Every structure is written in C-alpha cells, then in structure tokens.
Amino acid sequence: MCASGLRVNIARPSVVFGRGGASCELFIKLARLPVLVLPAGGRFDLQPVHANDVAEALANMATQPLPHGAVVNMAGSLKTTLAEYLAILRQTLHHRAAPAVWALPMGLLRPALPLTNIVSNGFLSQGSLKLLAQGSVADTGDFARVLGREPLGAEEFYRYP
C-alpha cells in the first residue's frame, strides 16, 4: 500500500471502548460479575482507547498532513491489565467494588480452547489469548499530537458513553 503512490497512514488502535461493539459489551457484562475467573488471572497488559478518540483522530488524520507511511498507535492514557480494566468498568459503570479475580491456569485452559472458541463465538480462542499475551500498550505521543490533547484513560470512559 505504501508503495502505491498514494499517501498512506496507518492507525493501530488498542482495545477499543465503544458502546455497541461486541468486545466492549462483553467486557461491560463481565464487569457486572462479583467474581471473575480469568486466564492467568487477567494479567495481560492493555491500554484501552475510547472509540470517540479513535474517530476524532481518524478525522484529523484525513485533514492533517502526516508523513507518508506514518503509524499512529491509538491507545488510552492509562496502562492497565485486563483484570484492572474490568475492575475499572465495574467501579465506574456499575458503581460496585472491584471483583474478586481467580486465576485460571493457562495449562488447564489450552485443551479446552476448541470448545471455548465455539461457545464464546471466538472471544476465547487460541488467537484471542495470543493477542492478549502479546499485550496492547503503546506510547501515546503521536496519538496525542493528532488529537491535539491527551487521550482519555479507561477511568474516564464512563463520562462519554
């Protein structure tokens, strides 16, 4: 694409918080639970980004000249873990104390992944666990410059449904 002669920029969003999105709605539902059983105790690094920030940055990228081939990592201002993110959603959206988190050892989960892939509609699959294990955090400097401000952190998402 970059070699096509067209001016190309790449947007790489982290985990996106946006009501109506399948993964976001799943996280909101999980955050209602007082006890969570999460692979590896939910110790996967995340830096969730609000959908409004992504949309605003994409609009700005369409109108602001960025260097050809620029990659903008779109991540929120708060680095957290999956377990902490679910606790933040529980506290800010549901006004409940942080959930108890029990760790599901990866060794016990792996043999069940073909079945969990089917019953979870792909949310709990070998691929999704691989993505979680890789983490989804990034420097937000370029993203903040495109936005013209710091991106929202997960603790602020409830203000902008």
Briefly describe each language-model feature range.
Residues M1-G20, K29:
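Conserved beta-loop-beta element that borders a ligand/cofactor-binding pocket
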Residues A22-S23, A40-T63, A70-N73:
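Substrate-positioning beta->alpha
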Residues F27-P39:
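A short C-terminal helix-loop "cap" of Rossmann-like NAD(P)-dependent dehydrogenase/epimerase domains
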Residues D45-N52, V72-T92, A103-P114, E150-G153:
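Substrate-binding strand-loop-helix patch
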Residues A55-A62, L86-L89, A154, Y158-P161:
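Hydrophobic "lid"/C-terminal helical patch
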Residues M61-G76, R96-V101, Q126:
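Core catalytic loop region at the nicotinamide-binding pocket of NAD(P)H-dependent oxidoreductases
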Residues R90-Q134:
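Terminal hydrophobic/aromatic helix or amphipathic segment near a protein terminus
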Residues Q134-P161:
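Amphipathic terminal alpha-helices
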